[in-house]
Each structure stands twice: as structure tokens, then as C-alpha cells.
Amino acid sequence: MLDAKIVVPTNEILQVYRKKILLLQTIMKQIEVVAAIIRKDDKVFATQRGYGEWKDWWEFPGGKVEPGETPEAALKREIREELSTEISVDTFVCTVDYDYPKFHLTMHCYYCSLLDEALHLNEHEAARWLTLEQLDSVDWLPADLVVAENIKNKR
């Protein structure tokens, strides 16, 4: 009796895998957003969603980048819309690529500072200033959890 073995070169498997990823990215809706990691003293600002499928989950404030808009300009606009305040965009932190069930998210994250201390929640149901030790105390949206872990590990 012969033992038949099929040998498939690793590079061929990788090519098939890469093609499947490209196909999925083509099919899935692509969303590009920005997020503000607003720092004050030893804390960062987190907001709780008050709407949609991810209602009650926590995130860093921000939103979609409009066509022709730089990430920094989008961040200033989104914070003005969501929190009625002005920020300075200080330092790039990271870009997170995350596949949600219905879309692929690319999120550019920046450390930011408040230029005006007054904040008003226009879209969120709650907000908290969290120390790095408190970052695990809220239920983050999956992509934002990646960011929270990133900044916690960079201390």
C-alpha cells in the first residue's frame, strides 16, 4: 500500500492567502477615521457611545476623514462637532487596522491637548478621564482596545 502525500510549497499557500485577503478588503466597506487621545495631567479622555450597534461601548473621540481632508484637520473638526471644544493635535501614536464584521476600519490615533477646558457631549452619553491604570475599567470598542493597550504599554 502506498502512502500518498501531497506537498504544497509554502509560497503557493501564502499567495492564495494574500489573494483572499485582498478580495475580502475589496468586498468589505473601507472606513478611515481619526481618534483623539486627549491628555490632561496623567489622564486620557474616553467617551461612551450613545447610539447605534455599539451603543454603550467606550472609544476615543473622533470620526471619519472626509475626502481631501488631512487626518489632523479631520480630528480638529470632529472634536469641535462632538465636544464643542478646540484641540491641538500633538503627536501621532499609531494606526490601527481592524476588521469588524461589516467593514474594515483604519484608525489614525494622535495625542491631543485641549485648548479650551470646556467640554460638551453632543453625541456621546458619558465621558471619563482615565488614568493608565483605569484603562481596563471600561468596555472599549475592539479597535479602541488596541489603542488603549498600545498607550498603556508605552508608559
Regions found by a protein language model. Give the residues of each.
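Active-site-adjacent beta-strand/loop module that shapes the phosphate/pyrophosphate-binding cleft
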Residues: 86, 96-118, 128
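Conserved Nudix-box catalytic region and its N-terminal flanking loop in Nudix hydrolases
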Residues: 40-81
